[in-house]
């Protein structure tokens, strides 16, 4: 990370030179005289109530208490116009942030009573959806992800058209964040910015431990449904996805877990928070997501609200993230530490080679032979120019039926019947 940061300075210096060359002037923002006055009034009248609300550990109860204070403030300033009311609410948000940040920097317990380094209570379950090929329910505090894994044939890969041409994605991850998971209502629609971004992060975190497609030729789809969210649902998805893949029998090289780190900084004073809540993300300075295995990091993403952090903060954040990741992996390994065998109802696949001069015979005139094999067995049979045959069935029985027919074709007189497509 520090090496990359050092290398970036060359580009940053060039950008600064370009800015000076162009002569872009900074925007001048008029000083707001009213918001500081409202802040002083709210601090005097409502600080104790806000501070008390932020000692409530349960998110729903805490939100209700804070909303009660908000309504009381709006009632007090009900005679103000819309612009002034907005400034009052801005002062209220600033006061919320000041109270939470001051408490943490002074060494007081965090909102839910934890110290800086404690991970919330964990619950790990696998095989929770009987008809799914693999599934897991991962819960960390008030954040929960229900993750399902589905295995399919190579033909089911997602076809993508990019500037580089056509390509196929054999590993898909869909992250769903319904409104109800944060106690809201909303119209179910297509994926939004959050779902696309969090899904991509979770996908990057696992790609490094997936088997090569040549060794495990399945198309894999992961769906993560966030059923409850209070901080870092994307990292819950990382943990649940790793578990569901191993539950499905996907031979990962190592389990992967993720954690979100936060930061409260005031001048030279700072505190790094492990496993942040939603409020700590909202009121703090950083949301630093770190995912990886026992051996190292597989994905990083940092959202930051201040100008930057120094090496000391980065070092402490990564060190604390590693400790938390090891703790989570230990809990995950207690439930499932290595991939299971493929379930009996999981798709079955086998690859083998034949002589190239046999390819035409296996396909048959107009594809008659290979179509006949697929119709009789219910399996999918693919053959490429190198002579590699892939047989894929919804279950072991269908795959074996196709294999038996292929073997029979070239060891008995039944071959003529199949070649004619009868």
Regions found by a protein language model. Give the residues of each.
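Flexible hinge/switch segments at interdomain interfaces of large molecular machines
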Residues: 40-44, 174-181, 213-217, 291-296, ...
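Extended amphipathic alpha-helical scaffolds
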Residues: 27-167, 347-361, 369, 376-377
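Mobile "lid/hinge" segments at catalytic clefts and subdomain interfaces of large enzymes
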Residues: 1-45, 248-338
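Glycine-rich, flexible beta-strand/loop modules in the N-terminal catalytic cores of phosphate-handling
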Residues: 128, 133-218, 296-306, 314-315
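Flexible, glycine/charged-enriched surface loops at secondary-structure junctions
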Residues: 11-29, 60-61, 80-88, 105-116, ...
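Short glycine/threonine-rich beta-strand-turn micro-motifs
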Residues: 385-395
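Conserved small/polar residues in nucleotide/adenosyl-binding loops
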Residues: 410-418
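Polar interaction faces of repeat-based domains
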Residues: 375-385, 408-409
